């Protein structure tokens, strides 16, 4: 029931309102229709490569053929929290022999900040890593270590292809669990570590794939090590959604539960999962902010670290049933409150998405569209999640959008439309009310003044900051909702050969 309940917040929105997801959906559209759409061929190129970040990119191929792209993405994204909850509860059951009531406090971490940020391949890989870890523990408990090795060889490759971080996390979890298992069988710590490493060789094949990927010309950098102030912020934001005090109170409650387990004589931690928490903590501290050009690498691990600590709490056999029921009631209430809040938050974000996406009804197929999305130098707790909404212009209109990510070796998509320079790619869609330190974002005035008029047919402003209206005096407004506006650029005419109605879905 908890697995099914975790899908509830995402049932209503037609486009899951996750920050980066519309941008990814734009790439999926190019991937699916780029070979048959003259407009998409003109604006973008797409080249398949084996990289450790292909989870949903591969899943949409068969599902979009059946359901259409938008519904296919929604169905996949809905499964991510459900799989995460299933993985957490399975691991708890394998370690404790039953699901302790405190494990329920980990359930809301399925809707963690990295997931809401739109790191969907990462979140999917972490959900699958938890499920694979549950299988690892079960087969060890049953004594089927040879079967486990045979299964983990292909599973590790599939997990790496989904996202390399999920594979790495599974390796950390598996090694720590096997270390404790070997230690409990009477081996010294050093020998237990060697034997655990031997068992984990079944997870090693993706190392060759990683080396091949990194030697193929990827320019992704790794940087910003040991930024402990940021790491504390990432922990504080583990449940970040919409209401700061509510989210912080909920996180504080889970912190109190963990602290209670540390000092209580009634309950304690499983040594198996305590070792996992220790190793994950070391990885979290050592991870830089940027890995292979992928930002927020350490931030992504923070909520899973807390969730594993929660499922590590163990109740001894002789504890009173009434006490267990009381803890279970509090934990279940916590799950229901967080689920209700996440559902309301998703509905509100969905309204914001729908209000702005109405502009696309006025954009012809194949249009050359430049978009500017407002944000502040310092984002409020409740992020707007609109920064990559322009990607939906690719999905629904086969239009050009300047929000796509490009990085040699790390992205499958590249931008061909050089006339748009420097408004070709992310983050040229971001505009701010004033210059921001250490950022390359333009102010709204700079963007409106300098985008090349002859390269675009339409300008889409999405919740922009105030700007000098004189910079839009040569543009024709054709749609408006609040401060969001769609302008037509009068002079350029759309090349007739690019007018092709996109397929449904």
Model-derived regions, located:
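Transmembrane catalytic cores of multi-pass membrane glycosyltransferases
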Residues: 13-24, 35-37, 44, 52-53, ...
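Short hydrophobic/aromatic helix or loop-helix immediately within or flanking a transmembrane segment
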Residues: 26-33, 44-69
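Transmembrane-helix motifs of polytopic, lipid-linked glycan transferases
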Residues: 75-95
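Transmembrane-helix signature of polytopic, membrane-embedded enzymes
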Residues: 88-110
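Short acidic/glycine- and proline-prone juxtamembrane loop motifs at membrane-interface regions
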Residues: 117-124
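Signature aromatic-anchored transmembrane alpha helix within multi-pass, membrane-resident enzymes
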Residues: 254, 311, 315-340
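Hydrophobic/aromatic-rich transmembrane helices and adjacent perimembrane loops
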Residues: 292-318
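Short periplasmic/luminal acceptor-recognition loop of GT-C membrane glycosyltransferases, typified by
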Residues: 349, 359-439, 449-464, 487
């Amino acid at each position: 029931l908890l697995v099914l309940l975790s899908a509830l917040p995402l049932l209503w929105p037609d486009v899951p309102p996750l920050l980066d997801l519309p941008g990814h959906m734009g790439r999926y559209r190019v991937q699916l229709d780029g070979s048959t759409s003259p407009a998409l061929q003109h604006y973008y190129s797409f080249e398949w490569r084996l990289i450790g970040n292909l989870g949903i990119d591969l899943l949409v191929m068969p599902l979009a053929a059946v359901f259409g792209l938008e519904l296919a993405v929604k169905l996949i994204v809905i499964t991510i929290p459900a799989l995460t909850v299933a993985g957490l509860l399975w691991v708890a059951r394998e370690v404790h022999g039953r699901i302790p009531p405190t494990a329920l406090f980990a359930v809301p971490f399925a809707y963690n900040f990295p997931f809401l940020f739109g790191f969907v391949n990462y979140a999917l890989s972490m959900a699958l890593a938890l499920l694979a870890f549950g299988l690892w523990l079960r087969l060890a408990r049953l004594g089927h270590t040879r079967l486990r090795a045979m299964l983990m060889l292909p599973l590790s490759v599939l997990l790496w292809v989904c996202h390399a971080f999920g594979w790495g996390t599974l390796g950390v979890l598996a090694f720590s669990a096997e270390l404790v298992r070997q230690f409990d069988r009477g081996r010294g710590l050093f020998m237990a570590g060697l034997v655990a490493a031997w068992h984990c060789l079944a997870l090693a094949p993706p190392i060759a794939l990683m080396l091949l990927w990194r030697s193929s010309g990827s320019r992704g950098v790794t940087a910003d090590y040991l930024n402990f102030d940021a790491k504390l912020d990432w922990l504080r934001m583990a449940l970040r959604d919409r209401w700061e005090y509510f989210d912080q109170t909920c996180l504080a409650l889970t912190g109190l539960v963990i602290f209670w387990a540390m000092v209580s004589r009634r309950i304690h931690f499983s040594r198996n999962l305590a070792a996992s928490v220790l190793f994950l903590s070391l990885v979290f501290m050592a991870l830089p902010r940027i890995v292979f050009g992928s930002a927020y690498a350490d931030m992504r691990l923070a909520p899973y670290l807390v969730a594993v600590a929660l499922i590590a709490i163990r109740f001894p056999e002789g504890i009173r049933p009434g006490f267990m029921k009381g803890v279970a009631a509090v934990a279940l209430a916590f799950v229901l409150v967080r689920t209700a809040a996440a559902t309301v938050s998703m509905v509100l974000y969905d309204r914001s998405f729908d209000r702005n996406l109405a502009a696309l009804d006025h954009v012809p197929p194949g249009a050359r569209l430049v978009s500017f999305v407002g944000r502040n130098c310092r984002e409020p707790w409740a992020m707007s999640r609109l920064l990559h909404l322009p990607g939906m212009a690719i999905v629904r209109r086969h239009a050009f959008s300047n929000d796509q990510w490009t990085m040699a070796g790390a992205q499958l998509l590249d931008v061909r439309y050089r006339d748009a320079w420097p408004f070709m790619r992310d983050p040229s869609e971001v505009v701010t009310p004033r210059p921001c330190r250490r950022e390359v974002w333009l102010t709204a005035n700079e963007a409106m003044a300098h985008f090349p008029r002859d390269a675009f047919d339409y300008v889409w402003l999405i919740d922009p900051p105030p700007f000098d209206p004189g910079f839009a005096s040569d543009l024709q407004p054709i749609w408006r909702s609040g401060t969001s506006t769609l302008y037509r650029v009068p002079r350029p005419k759309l090349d007739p050969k690019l007018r092709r109605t996109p397929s449904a879905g």
